[in-house]
Amino acid sequence: MKVILRADVENLGKLGDIVEVRPGYGRNFLLPQGMAMAATASNMKVFEMERRKLQAEMDAVRATATTLAEKIAAADVSIAVRVGENDKLYGSVTPAHIADALAEAGVEIDRRRILLDAPIRNLGEYDVRVRLHADVEAVIALKVVAEGRTEEADAEESAAEEPAVEEAAE
């Protein structure tokens, strides 16, 4: 079944592309969702008139995603977690935790848009990607800190450990 895409569809094509899809996918998903229309001669003429309007809408969505990406990049996000021995986390930091921390920073993001390569199971700083649009990705500078400790206390601990290590080496 040939269809004309009325929106960018991931792993299929961009707005205005004429693509061949399986009949069930076209009839049961793309057409009812308004993401495509059957590629007939009359629909092609109608689509050409509609194209500018759809492109303007897509550009507006992309611009909104870009401004949101700038907001995310500027946000200071840290998550306080419980830790055990050797600063190992109880459990892990999930996209839901990151979405909640972003919400506290004033940026609402759906947790499914947060892309983690692997679960976060240690304290430290991480760069986490967020896909806001097919063309727009943001990077969050995420700090995972121990619950109840401040950054100054961590800095004092590491400063106290350094001379002890040097003395032991002598």
From Swiss-Prot:
Biased composition, class Acidic residues, residue ranges: 153-170
GO molecular function, one term: structural constituent of ribosome
Residue span of region Disordered: 149-170
InterPro entries: Ribosomal_bL9 (IPR000244), Ribosomal_bL9/RNase_H1_N (IPR009027), Ribosomal_bL9_bac/chp (IPR020594), Ribosomal_bL9_C (IPR020069), Ribosomal_bL9_C_sf (IPR036791), Ribosomal_bL9_N (IPR020070), Ribosomal_bL9_N_sf (IPR036935)
KW Ribosomal protein (keyword) present: yes
PROSITE patterns: RIBOSOMAL_L9
GO BP terms in the entry: translation
A Pfam family per the record: Ribosomal_L9_C
One GO CC term on file: ribonucleoprotein complex
Function, in words: Binds to the 23S rRNA.
UniProt protein name: Large ribosomal subunit protein bL9
Species assigned in the record: Oleidesulfovibrio alaskensis (strain ATCC BAA-1058 / DSM 17464 / G20) (Desulfovibrio alaskensis)
